[in-house]
Amino acid sequence: TETGTPTLRELEFLVMEVYAEPYATQIALDDARLDIEQWLAGEVMVTFAEQEGAAFITGSGVKRPRGLLTYPTVANASYAWGSIGFVVTGGAAAFASSNPGDAFVDLFYALKAGYRAGASWLTSDAVMASIRKFKDGQGNYLWAPPTAPEAPSTILGKPVQTDDNMPALGANNFPVAFGDFRRA
């Protein structure tokens, strides 16, 4: 059978400005052992990363990006364009007490196959501390350490990123995200 007529939708992505104002004392500037250019670049990089992380996760969309967690949420089975689908964890305000890793398997396969290839996990450090203890039915941890110096740790073979702008475990919170954020 033929597919229906495709429709296109124009999306607007506004460019916003971020800035940093690193402070260096005269003593630091005069210190020949300190690579001031490298130090300043590092300070600016950290500040930009913190601002961008907050904007992309919780931003209001007013003079900044609209954050991932500000979109309407719907149960994944009822997914609609412009919404974020979710999978329940099995616990009221936390992960299920038995087999908590099952929610990760459910979330992994809830994401359409075309998006799984470039997908990664996103959570806070506090939630990651809980996740690292989850095991499968054979006693293997779901979390795996990096396999090389620059490689990320993984869950179910997909990279894990942490950002403390993600919410804590709790009722009606979405403490873990999984998707191809480059295509989101």
What are the residue ranges of the model-derived segments?
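Structured, hydrophobic secondary-structure cores that serve as assembly/anchoring elements
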Residues: 1-184
